[in-house]
């Protein structure tokens, strides 16, 4: 896009950033001071980097799925003699969103992301992945790896796993407590998912087997102070977890809008 168009009010783009090439992006809309809307005709992922920028700037945006659904409905009307209308288009769109949107859990180490994620997967009949569990298949015990290789090396491995899982759809994903310390993880998680932050008092957090949580309650308080703003910047919804997984699962209001 020419810099001469930065005064435009609407941005429409297609092709760049579609799976499996996400999160590629060629346009930085931060320079468009008068932008009022963004349309990206890509439908996989749900939110390209372009749309994530629009979301960050509170600019209305739309992906390509509504166009794809409407096209299919019109084809059915034309070739099969159906009489589907706006109501059917909206229902199909809601159903597809519900089926495809990932549920992402973030929060402090020991807050219960694994327990809650497993319960949500079982309740909704979804495939559940725990990032740390998946990493252990590749690098062995996480605590041992961090001790021997350092946290920076671990975060890079973690980011690679998040990027891999984030391209998929219809999953429940329990992340590690420190994933929010790597900014690029946000785009990988948000592109196809809604991010929920689980919270509970520091005194109730489990520290067993967690090398980065060792040091007792004071260390946990330090982590909480540092990471809370990061969790809040990632999350679309905050859910208090009181160690009752069924109640927490019921409290997660899965939303499929912006």
Language model regions located:
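ATP-dependent small-molecule kinase phosphotransfer cores
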Residues: 133-190
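Conserved lysine of the Walker
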Residues: 113
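Conserved small/polar residues in nucleotide/adenosyl-binding loops
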Residues: 1, 5-14, 257-258
